A protein has these predicted regions:
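N-terminal secretory signal peptides that target proteins for export/translocation
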Residues: 1-4
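Sequence-pattern detector for short linear motifs
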Residues: 7-8, 30, 232, 498
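Aromatic- and Gly/Pro-enriched helix-to-coil junctions and flexible linker segments
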Residues: 22-191, 199, 203-207, 275-281
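Beta-strand-centric surfaces of beta-sandwich/beta-rich domains
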Residues: 105-120, 148-347, 352-487, 495-498
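Compositionally biased, intrinsically disordered/low-complexity regions enriched for serine, proline
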Residues: 13-14, 22, 33, 56, ...
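Bacterial N-terminal signal peptides
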Residues: 8-18
């Protein structure tokens, strides 16, 4: 393929108009300045007096809430029947209006109006849905005609698998934690997968199964689970079955409580080889605070078809700092910055902010020339560590040389309900009382040909050159003919390959 080169200066590209609507509250790095999202029903053509549970609210709850808020679903209350929901109506209005900050429900914290808004498995509420909920509660939360109710969702008897039954389930060892006691860190061993052939993984979902009754009246995530997080790898077992063969190991996305499944798009996939095992090498367990609990992690793998080979090379997240950070006590709006220059064309698959208890917000930017493109800003709640997987047509396509900039916002004041003590300085560390500032998201490296193909597909989706795709800010950049220097470089490269 002939070399192509884009203009280094982006002055010819128009920056997108600011998408932040006047109706949205301004977000910063302080908890004290958090404001709810409040909407008028009339702005969405909604007659506030006609909003009822049966006709309007039940469908919203089915889509975005009942996977957890149902009998056996893991949440502290059921939100299925009207008599269950009515008593929580004011609380539902309050928690949904928080929207993208700690404490919000449902826990999907992408800030609207800023950057890319197309994500897989997005169960967040729209502006219109928030307006509907607020109108319903303000009007007395009427039930309406039960004939308007949608058909009930048939949920599984247990907490089930979010993505459906896996092709392979690998069970970790049972671990027991006392009702009250110190946290436990460490390696909990190897778990063979039982695979007899190499398979590429389409998705992996990790869930905790424990002996806490599903109907227990628990109001915190930490009271229901004992595994806070798990770092694990895979590889081929050695002949003795006592370890992994050197050179065959690879790391998997970290499991964290409240985290959604990892989905690897077509063209990617992670290899789980024959005669392999999972190495559960870094587990963090804690007491629930109210009962002795025995639990284990189950790893649910779904595979691409046999014979599948990935097209792309996997890369990691966008960087950050988990060691050398200085978090000051009793101060809101603290900012931490990390920069990384891309050495390859890159497609970002998922953005996953990882902070600790003081964390409030993280933003992801791409810097090209003199221009800065805010790809996303996402709120953070250490009780619900989430990854945000881009829809394929919206995933950021970044040329090599792009500077990827992440900004973390921390608040160590008493306004932050996740903070144990506002008085102490804290540095980096693995415990929740220490701090991290990392993007754990996923990306892939692209060849020049793959990059050009991806951009051509994105351009084909646009109506004309006035359309704008912030995830592909190079899509409409004019190409220029290769220079003599480019030709010389190609010649030298070809000679090197032939030697």
């Amino acid at each position: 393929m002939s070399a192509r080169r884009f203009l280094g200066s982006m002055a010819i590209l128009l920056l997108p108009p600011t998408a932040l609507s006047a109706q949205y509250p301004v977000r910063d790095g302080t908890v004290a300045n958090m404001e709810p999202y409040v909407f008028a029903a009339a702005d969405f053509g909604i007659d506030a007096s006609s909003v009822t549970f049966s006709k309007d609210i039940a469908p919203i709850l089915q889509r975005s809430c009942q996977s957890c808020h149902r009998e056996g679903g893991g949440a502290p209350m059921s939100l299925v029947a009207y008599n269950e929901v009515r008593r929580w109506a004011p609380r539902i209005k309050e928690r949904t209006a928080i929207r993208d900050r700690m404490g919000a429900m449902p826990p999907f914290f992408v800030e609207p109006g800023i950057g890319i808004q197309d994500f897989k498995n997005d169960y967040s509420l729209s502006d219109g849905e928030l307006a509907t909920i607020q109108a319903w509660v303000d009007n007395g939360a009427p039930e309406g005609d039960r004939a308007d109710l949608p058909p009930a969702v048939e949920w599984p008897d247990d907490r089930g698998w979010v993505l459906g039954e896996p092709d392979l389930v690998v069970q970790g060892p049972d671990m027991t934690m006392p009702a009250v006691g110190p946290d436990r860190w460490g390696d909990i061993g190897l778990v063979p997968t039982g695979l007899t052939q190499d398979r590429y993984v389409m998705s992996v979902e990790v869930r905790e199964v424990n002996d806490i009754p599903t109907d227990a009246d628990i109001t915190t995530v930490g009271g229901r689970y004992i595994f806070h997080h798990m770092t694990y790898t895979s590889g081929q077992l050695n002949d003795e079955g006592s370890g992994l063969v050197e050179g065959t190991t690879q790391g998997w996305p970290i499991h964290e409580v409240g985290r959604n499944p990892d989905i690897f798009p077509e063209g990617l996939g992670m290899l789980l080889p024959a005669n392999s095992a999972l190495s559960l090498r870094a587990s963090h367990l804690h007491s629930t605070g109210w009962r002795e609990t025995t639990g284990r992690l189950e790893f649910g793998f779904r595979f691409f078809p046999e014979g599948y080979e990935p097209e792309y090379r996997r890369a990691g997240g966008s960087g950050g700092n988990g060691i050398d950070i200085d978090v000051r006590p009793n101060e809101g709006g603290q900012e931490f910055h990390s920069y990384r220059v891309l050495e390859d064309h890159t497609k970002i698959i998922a953005f996953e902010p990882h902070l600790h208890a003081p964390g409030v917000r993280m933003c992801l930017e791409a810097i090209w020339g003199t221009n800065r493109f805010t790809l996303n800003c996402v709120g953070y709640d250490h009780n619900w560590v989430k990854q945000y997987i881009y829809e394929d047509h919206a995933a950021p396509l970044l040329p090599k040389g792009t500077i990827v900039h992440i900004v973390g916002f921390l608040d160590t004041t008493a306004e932050n309900p996740n903070l144990a003590d506002t008085r102490n300085w804290a540095g980096g560390g693995r415990r929740s009382v220490a701090n991290m500032f990392i993007d754990l998201g996923q990306s892939v490296r692209l060849t020049e040909e793959q990059f050009q193909t991806e951009m051509a597909e994105r351009r084909a989706r646009m109506k004309d050159r006035n359309a704008y795709d912030i995830g592909c800010f190079m899509c409409w950049a004019p190409e220029i003919a290769p220079t003599a220097a480019d030709a010389d470089a190609q010649t030298q490269a070809a000679r090197g390959q032939n030697q």
